[in-house]
Amino acid sequence: GAITDALSRNGKFPLTLIVLDEVQQYIGSDTQKAYLVQEVTETLCKHFKGQLLFVGTGQSALSGTANLQRLMARFPVPVMLGDWDVENVTRKIILAKKPTAQPEVDRIWRANLGEISRHLRGTKLEHVTDDESVMTADYPILPVRRRFWEKVLRTIDTTGTVSQLRSQLRVVHEAVLATADQAVGQVVAGDFLYDQIAANLVSTAQLPREVFENVQKFAAGDERMQLKGRLLKLIFLINKLPSETALDIGLRATEDVLADLLVTDLKAGSSELRKALPPLLDELQHKDRLVMSLDGGGGTEYRLQTRES
């Protein structure tokens, strides 16, 4: 048939893998679709005498729903994805570096370990010694920020690890593209995640349109206005964490935390940035009336102030 003609080489049919991406979402609760997927995979596997292998992906195990259980005989090997798999895929596929570039990356982060290790200190996301074994592999994303992103993505996407993997792959890929032309020593800011998920969050009513429009307005302004917009993005992302999660990891949108996540130039350090934040936060609170401050034991915390709140 057409498949044999297209794939055969020298009259031999090669071992062939076919991936049915998001087959679970395609089938849904439709028993007819489940039956058709079962029939097609069985027929083709028999016809090609085991030379054809099907892999199906979904948000949860096949045993999770009655409609998918009928496929278990056809897809007998379950593979559950965990956080470690997500990190491995992003490091090996997207963040891989030429061997010639690795020594320079290694030298830069080691020279700036003082700045890196102070970020989010005192929280469960803080720098740990183990980070140093993946720092070169993760560059231009700092491990502390990767952990922050994972927490936020898990909060906004409750469908499962497969979907989170896709979200993380996309975000990491965009982060690499955004920093590709910059000098070694530039890292991706914590607020970068906002730009990747904002449109989707507006459409699902998880991001107030008022916040979205103000961020866009600030982004179109000068450097000072842009920094205000970035503060707003970060405050939104941190506020997005459920209160029990934020309490558990010890993360609050304080001046120090915001500065820790905003630093992009490791060589320049963060002292100038830290000096610039207080007047901007004051403006966002008293002039723009977009944030409010709450005084607590660990310093002043900032929260979004929208008409809805």
Spans of model-derived segments:
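Conserved nucleotide-binding/hydrolysis micro-motifs of P-loop NTPases
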Residues: 24-25, 59-64, 83-87, 145-146, ...
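Substrate-engagement module of ASCE P-loop NTPases
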Residues: 2-9, 36-52, 96
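C-terminal helical "lid" subdomain and adjoining coupling/linker elements of P-loop NTPases
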Residues: 33, 105, 116-230, 234-237, ...
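Conserved small helical "lid"/interfacial subdomain of P-loop NTPases
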Residues: 80-124, 139-141
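Short, amphipathic alpha-helical interaction segments positioned at domain boundaries
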Residues: 297-309
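Conserved P-loop NTPase "ATPase switch" module shared by AAA+ and STAND
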Residues: 7-31
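Sensor-1/coupling segment of RecA-like P-loop NTPase cores
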Residues: 44-68
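A short, conserved structural fragment
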Residues: 268, 281-297
